[in-house]
Amino acid sequence: ELIPSLLSGAGIVSMDQIDTSYEGTPQRFVTDPSIMQQGFGTNEPFVYENEISQWMKPVAFQYLHELGYSIYPEPITVREADVAAQADCLTKLVPILQRSQLDFLADPERTNALIVDLVDRYQTSWTYSAGAAEFSAQAQLDDGLVFDDPTSGVFGQIDGARIAETVATFVPVLKATGSLAADAVVDPETLYTTQFIDPSITAESVLGED
């Protein structure tokens, strides 16, 4: 309930508007479009407009980062104790990860085809069409979701001020919901390192200016 708690704490919604039983299908929204549903702005708008036969029209949406949910989503993490031991590997791996995301956005067709094929083969109940994949890659660019770190100009660089803001925003929420001990102390500086980042890799150099 982290996101609902954040939105409620900011006065955007009240907890009695929150339904945490969402099971991952569009049925809930289609039957009651007055609700606000959690999803991906790089996926659900396309799916509702093009693939949900009971809807087939645009939906309004807003990104949570515009409301204070300014995390680094799905970061690559390593246990602190393993950083030194795996330093040689990380020195080689991290620049590959930096560059691969940019290379994907520069030419997503081949990777998108592979993802769509794997989704179909594994049949995990997740669905993903070629149209949705194409929309997602383009939306990441059009909506300004992929960009160089504003402070350093490096792609993939962690901004310490942003981490500190995230900690300041979410630690009180985590404590209030019982997910974090009330006396817990979280030092933002201990949560990240830029040690293995290749500073020569930039979105501007690969994707060009907007």
Where are these regions (language model features)?
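Conserved C-terminal helix/tail region of periplasmic/extracytoplasmic solute-binding proteins
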Residues: 160-210
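Hinge/capping helix and adjacent helix->loop/strand transition within the periplasmic-binding protein
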Residues: 3-17, 84-88, 92
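Pocket-lining segment of extracytoplasmic ligand-binding domains
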Residues: 23-27, 32-125
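Flexible, active-site-adjacent loop/turn segments at secondary-structure boundaries
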Residues: 46, 74-76, 81, 145, ...
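Secondary-structure end/capping motifs
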Residues: 85-178
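A local structural motif
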Residues: 7-21, 34, 54-61, 180
